[in-house]
């Protein structure tokens, strides 16, 4: 039951962080490109690498907390569904280049940031 509570609490926090962080990014740089979604997914990619690598190498993070942070917080923070919808809308609007850049940069940059998170955890 503790795991479910962690998932719920951290999930709510992750959703709120996504809402405010992506909104803040859009306020700064505009909506010509899905920058807000891009930003939260990059942050989430780094954190999943960091949290998973650190928690699997250390006893400081309980399995319940790890699940709460990854499934809960990062599940609420990151969003594949919004990424998919925004990309689809770009395609529908005839913005093939922007949609392609979104897909390629999102996947590649998120993989790099996951690796950076893993590397950071190994350094700690």
Swiss-Prot record:
Keyword Kinase assigned to the entry: answer is no
Which GO molecular function annotations are given, in alphabetical order? fluoride channel activity; metal ion binding
A GO cellular component annotation here is: plasma membrane
Which subcellular locations apply to this protein? Answer: Cell inner membrane
Q: Which InterPro entries does the entry link to? A: FluC
On the tree of life, the source organism's domain of life is Bacteria
Provide the membrane topology annotation.
Multi-pass membrane protein
Q: Does the record bear Cell inner membrane in its keywords?
A: yes
Pfam family name, one: CRCB
Q: Which GO terms describe its biological process?
A: cellular detoxification of fluoride
Question: Per the entry, what modulates this protein's activity?
Answer: Na(+) is not transported, but it plays an essential structural role and its presence is essential for fluoride channel function.
Reactions performed catalytically: fluoride(in) = fluoride(out)
Enumerate the residues binding Na(+): 75, 78
Q: Where are the transmembrane segments?
A: 4-24, 32-52, 68-88, 96-116
Q: Which UniProt keywords apply?
A: Cell inner membrane, Cell membrane, Ion channel, Ion transport, Membrane, Metal-binding, Sodium, Transmembrane, Transmembrane helix, Transport
What does this protein's UniProt record list under function? Answer: Fluoride-specific ion channel. Important for reducing fluoride concentration in the cell, thus reducing its toxicity.
**Which family does the similarity line name?**
Belongs to the fluoride channel Fluc/FEX (TC 1.A.43) family.
Q: Which HAMAP family match?
A: FluC (MF_00454)
Q: Which PANTHER family has this protein been placed in?
A: FLUORIDE EXPORT PROTEIN 1-RELATED (PTHR28259:SF1)
What name is this protein filed under? Fluoride-specific ion channel FluC
Identify the gene encoding this protein: fluC
């Amino acid at each position: 039951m503790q795991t479910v509570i962690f998932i719920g609490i951290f999930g709510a926090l992750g959703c709120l962080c996504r809402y405010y962080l992506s909104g803040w990014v859009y306020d700064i740089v505009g909506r010509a490109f899905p920058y807000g979604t891009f930003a939260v997914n990059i942050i989430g990619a780094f954190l999943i690498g960091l949290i998973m690598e650190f928690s699997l190498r250390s006893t400081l993070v309980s399995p319940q907390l790890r699940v709460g942070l990854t499934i809960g917080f990062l599940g609420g923070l990151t969003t594949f569904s919004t990424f998919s919808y925004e990309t689809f809308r770009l395609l529908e609007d005839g913005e093939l280049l922007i949609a392609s850049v979104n897909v390629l940069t999102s996947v590649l940059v998120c993989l790099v940031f996951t690796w950076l998170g893993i590397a950071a955890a190994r350094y700690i």
